[in-house]
Amino acid sequence: MLQIKNLYAYYGKIEALSGVTCHVRTGEIVTLIGANGAGKTTLLNSLCGLVRSRGNISFDGASIMHLAPEAVVACGISQAPEGRQIFAPLTVEENLELGAYLRFRQRQQQEIAVDLKKIYDLFPRLWERRLQAAGALSGGEQQMLAIGRALMAKPRLLLLDEPSLGLAPLMVDIIMDTVVRLRREGVTILMVEQNARTALGIADRGYVLETGRIILSGPAADLLNDRQVTRAYLGKDYREFTEGR
């Protein structure tokens, strides 16, 4: 589905990604893990046309390099960004409708109404708060809203940037259960997560990004048991803890 080959990305003269090559197959959950500043968000933003880059990015066999962000969305890719970036003064429902802005232009109002109901079925709390200002939501509710807004574009590939950031453990479980459910319903997912243990626990495969380069990749279960990953991202006692259970 998604092929990234020899990708470089820049902020001014600063090189943020250095020859990244990776892929996502249809129906997978793939996670990118790494420390702050490793380039994870830059990679997602490069896919969305938000960062100057060179190399090759193809989606379903067609190049999406240098497409405008709205054209990337039209191809079937949408993102729930880091920090959620909701429109705080607007209502929950208005935020969700903004996720379907391209479809409004195509006069798909009836389909949009159906999909809005699906989002409320996925996140009942959003239905309860639909007429309230989005800025009044809790952190977990705002994350639900960010994911719901991205889904309103009807993506085939959903990009999630730090979906567990700042959330209580119970809410993290709810969000990750939702990610698994979305995959079952046919949405392919590429997820950036600093919480490596949580991300690898639900992913099929993973990539470890360090200072703009992929340094390790493989099945999620293998990465969970890799000594380098264990010490750098899971804590030095994680292996002993799991082996002692």
PLM feature spans:
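Glycine-rich phosphate-binding loops of nucleotide-dependent enzymes
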Residues: M1-R245
